[in-house]
Amino acid sequence: MARTPTLNFDRGTLILHPPPRGKGWMDYATWDDRVQKFRIPAIRYRSLVEALQAEDVNFIDEAKKFYPVDLVPSLEMEPYPHQTEALAAWKLAGRQGVVVLPTAAGKTYLAQMAMQSTPRTTLIVVPTLDLMHQWYAHLVAAFPDAEVGLLGGGSRDRTAILVATYDSAAIHAETLGNQYGLIVFDECHHLPTDFNRVIAEYAIAPYRLGLSATPERTDGKHADLNILIGEEVYRKRAEDLAGKALAEHEIVQIKVKLSQLERERYNQLIQTRNDFLKQSRISLGSLQGWQMFVQMSARSQSGRRAMLAHREAKDIALGTDGKLRILVNLLAEHYPARILIFTADNATVYRISQELLIPAITHQTPVKERHEILTKFREGKYNTLVASHVLNEGVDVPAASVAIILSGTGSAREYTQRLGRVLRKGNIENKQAILYEVVAEDTSEEGTSARRRGERNNVDAPAASRSQSVPKGRVPQRHGGRREEEEKGKLQVVYGSGKERSLKAAEQLEINYSTGSSKSKNQNSADVTDRVTDASPKRGGDYSEETEN
């Protein structure tokens, strides 16, 4: 009598033996001469199971170690409309996909909603230890009866709900891969790196949710998210949620003129750099321009002078004294509001901290000291903080209402995250947030500013009407940035493809678990069929799983 094929998990892969009948499963399998068995990538688990079930193939699933969990929230909160829409879109996509929401738009609560509607053992992956502890605190409060653990920062728990850093999850991917039915990738733009992607590739999780404010990557690898998690299923911008889930906000760009001495020195340095670039036939605007400049600068004395000139010119633009005069005036105008100051480098952070007696946070700040500073800021003991990059991602400071960018990179992600630091409403009614972007006029900073705001063309053209030139450190008059109320109408789900579908069917989607008799002929055990059924017609994500008890 032929043996029933068995599916096993083996260090990030699947082994199916003996080979079952049918052909559908062969699209995912590769013969492994070392073990004389067929091996399948773990990420193909769902597709493989669906293919076997479609051909009515009996098999024993010993790969799956995830299981249903009882998630009863301690407090029911009414979600914002965009959270309801995003959850419905994710369900319609088969509970696989990426949701793009601005910072502070409630991505954590959306993940909680996804966990409640898909109550399985769940792995949440985050980029930093600060975020790991924030998620842990949220989940412990949300599900007091659930077992929540940590993986990272010295913790090595294995619990039904596990919060892990990307680094730790990647290191343990071979053993975590079959333990969790749902994986939530927070800040999922971190996933498609050579090191981190194994978290998704070595996992059999049939349900996957990616969360990010800016999933796009400069290396183009964000396209891999379609395979690792699923396609983008929902997107909203900060402007779409202003005054609703997010605080009303306005953005003001202040252009500062260099002093005469700074201008003369800046022009001299830029000329030195440009002469070398012209001689070497290098264009910094080309795809490989910067890399070629770095390589050529190491080969000659003139190249080294050009690189040093470039760096000094950049330092002048980033740290001009005019910016500090503007900063002092902005701090005085907005006192006693909570203010976050962002710079591109630690040297400027420490200069501001020392000259203006403002608490500073950089990557060099000890964790205990960082937590103490942030706690005092939240409690109102500190009104102002200055930081470089460490507050860009994942730090919850809802009390902040003013952000001042003195310098930064051309990254749209960094810009979005810095804006998001002041958009969180918290418990503040009618919060009005404002972002100041202070830019040195007629310097490379103007191009950097244009890139991070998505204005890639005509970066040397005059700035928009909101931008104002301030030669003597005066604070400009602000212009209203309030977005007009959207037209009321039929609720729609907007997909990444631009297509729209009515939520009528999505609102009926529920996930139900039922047991039934298995078709397996194994008389020594009873198989439990764990099914996901919807009240609406089945779509690509309808999925049934079989395990042997």
Predicted regions and their residues:
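A short beta-strand element within the Helicase C-terminal
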Residues: E393-G408, I434-E437
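Walker A/P-loop
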Residues: G94-M115
